[in-house]
Amino acid sequence: MQKPPRTAAIIVAAGRGLRAGAGGPKQYRTLAGRPVIARALQPFCTHPEVFAVQPVTNPDDTATFNEAVAGLDFRPAVGGGATRQASVRAGLEALAELNPDIVLIHDAARPFVTPDLISRAIVAAGQTGAALPVIAVNDTVKQVDAEGCVVATPDRAQLRIAQTPQAFRFDVILDAHRRAARDGRDDFTDDAAIAEWAGLTVSTFEGDAANMKLTTPEDFSREESRLTAALGDIRTGTGYDVHAFGDGDHVWLCGLKVPHNRGFLAHSDGDVGLHALVDAILGALADGDIGSHFPPTDPQWKGAASDKFLKYAVDRVAARGGRIANLEVTMICERPKIGPLRDPMRQRIAEITGVPVSRVAVKATTSERLGFTGREEGIAATASATIRLPWSPWGAEGQAS
């Protein structure tokens, strides 16, 4: 049996994406709660035939990139150049030490690439050495002059729209890029054009209409609406937590260190607000509770910061392809007073979860001096979480719901 080719992938993410409007480089903007760059990277990182994934980024974006793609497995990013062509060459040079048989070159602005399209690219490159995915042109195309007047109507039967990932034998596309750089040619808009210039025959294979490139604000608006509509399984969970006071000079509440004349008796930092939110999110997922994921008998959680627990719960939602629609927590105590802390608490929860602060509510009440909270023996918190998951008639265990 013939061995499959050793395939690597380059994800080009060094551009600025100015046509996409405000909000920073488009590859770091979110769609349905998930960064575009993460959506583009994951299919390559998890594809069984791709052994190495090489991101190419702008060095100014290092922190943003690392946060956006946390949890994915890939090679350390390399810095890009002034043009897409220079960025691709940087990625190729970084992969040279691995000497793959095939390289796939993909734009981070195409976040809807599928495993099937990646597989077709690998097969095509193995057969012809240079190939790109294309889709048919369905509209009539007009060629115009500088004044916008029509000068020709090309035969659309001979036209195709190019996509990525474009696939090549690694040695030939690396050589083509190096030759173009030596000759001062830096005006190519894709890698297939460089291959053509270098004298290679470039074949085509079936692309995917859904594998669109995000370019304008309208693209983002349309795809956000489409993805959100697909998240039709709306779920709500509730949570409750309580901790008694002990010795200390501060308490942790909703991610903030709050000065107080007492501390919490707790295994972790005792943040009742975040603990209640964790239980609410896990409840919405039907995924146990905070104690089952972080047992108080486990010494590794002794004194642990509760923002880790909340981030873990948020990641569980993302792993199911979902997003958090709303978070609400109610603090029940006499002191400390929550009112002055309400907005900083909302902001901190938003920072931990990645949920817009406009979708985070913090409320406070007392028990009218009744019970343990009324006697100032501790603090309680209730929480609710609304999440949206991809709709399916099947439950998490594969049974009809």
Curated annotation (Swiss-Prot):
Catalytic activity line of the entry: 2-C-methyl-D-erythritol 4-phosphate + CTP + H(+) = 4-CDP-2-C-methyl-D-erythritol + diphosphate; 4-CDP-2-C-methyl-D-erythritol 2-phosphate = 2-C-methyl-D-erythritol 2,4-cyclic diphosphate + CMP
EC number: 2.7.7.60, 4.6.1.12
UniProt region (2-C-methyl-D-erythritol 4-phosphate cytidylyltransferase), positions on chain: 1-234
Binding positions (4-CDP-2-C-methyl-D-erythritol 2-phosphate): D241, V242, H243, H267, S268, D289, I290, G291, T365, T366, S367, E368, F372, R375
Record-listed a divalent metal cation binding positions: D241, H243, H275
UniProt keyword list: Isoprene biosynthesis, Lyase, Metal-binding, Multifunctional enzyme, Nucleotidyltransferase, Transferase
Keyword Transferase attached: yes
Pfam families in alphabetical order: IspD, YgbB
KW Ligase (keyword) present: no
One GO term of the biological process aspect: isopentenyl diphosphate biosynthetic process, methylerythritol 4-phosphate pathway
Gene Ontology MF, one: 2-C-methyl-D-erythritol 4-phosphate cytidylyltransferase activity
Cofactor(s) essential for the protein: a divalent metal cation
Region feature 2-C-methyl-D-erythritol 2,4-cyclodiphosphate synthase, mapped onto this chain: 235-401
Family: In the N-terminal section; belongs to the IspD/TarI cytidylyltransferase family. IspD subfamily. In the C-terminal section; belongs to the IspF family.
Function recorded in the entry: Bifunctional enzyme that catalyzes the formation of 4-diphosphocytidyl-2-C-methyl-D-erythritol from CTP and 2-C-methyl-D-erythritol 4-phosphate (MEP) (IspD), and catalyzes the conversion of 4-diphosphocytidyl-2-C-methyl-D-erythritol 2-phosphate (CDP-ME2P) to 2-C-methyl-D-erythritol 2,4-cyclodiphosphate (ME-CPP) with a corresponding release of cytidine 5-monophosphate (CMP) (IspF).
Name of the molecule in the record: Bifunctional enzyme IspD/IspF
